[in-house]
UniProtKB/Swiss-Prot annotation:
GO terms for biological process: peptide biosynthetic process. The keyword Metal-binding does not apply. Its main location: cytoplasm. PANTHER family: ELONGATION FACTOR P, ELONGATION FACTOR P (EF-P) FAMILY PROTEIN. PROSITE patterns: EFP. Disulfide bonds: none annotated. This is Elongation factor P. Transmembrane segments: none annotated.
Length: 185
């Protein structure tokens, strides 16, 4: 159980059987009555935002969340297949729950999977990753100053915009949150 005094950004709580992550919170005292805590919460299951106000000192439950080290095996239609690194148990996760992160998964890659009551919810990947360019238009020699970009297909199938001087076979660093080119490796 958490008290409202334990609230901080990123804390995961359960309200009325639904897991939430605290995005923002503010303690305030109205002119009359006890102190309150106004929170902005993200529903972990749906991603929707919700504002909930708690009385100061009110208790909320900890959600049944668990993080496990897993290995990404392969993609099967609209599902991602992971293997637990300790039990070797395989888990299916719908692509729709990954929020675009599936474009950064390579076969055999290790990552952390967030589970709620045993069901996979989200994957935790690094903020930036180095991936190989497998398909792009040839670049013009010496054109390194202009701000022109072109699409490049990466080894995972993800397509990102890269500067014109990037060629097939180059290894590039990509921001996993914005899917932007960060530099060559």
């Amino acid at each position: 159980m958490y008290s409202t005094t334990d609230f901080r950004k990123g804390l995961k709580i359960e309200v009325e059987g639904i897991p939430y992550e605290i995005v923002d919170f503010q303690h305030f005292k109205p002119g009359k009555g006890g102190a309150m805590v106004r929170t902005k919460l993200r529903n972990i299951l749906t991603g929707r935002m919700q504002d909930i106000t708690f009385r100061s000192g009110e208790k909320v439950n900890k959600p049944d969340l668990e993080t496990r080290d897993m290995q990404f095996l392969y993609r099967q239609d609209d599902d991602l297949i992971f293997m637990d690194m300790t039990t070797y148990e395989q888990l299916q996760m719908p692509v729709s729950t990954t929020d675009g992160k599936e474009g950064f998964l390579k076969d055999g890659q290790e990552c952390r999977v967030l589970l709620y009551k045993g069901n996979p919810l989200d994957i935790d990947i690094p903020v930036s990753m180095v991936l190989a360019v497998v398909e792009t238009e040839p670049g013009a020699k010496g054109d390194t100053v202009s701000n022109v970009t072109k699409p490049a297909k990466l080894e995972t199938g993800l397509v990102v915009q890269v500067p014109i001087f990037v060629n097939e076979g180059d290894r590039i660093k990509v921001d996993t949150r914005s899917k932007e080119y960060l530099g060559r490796e």
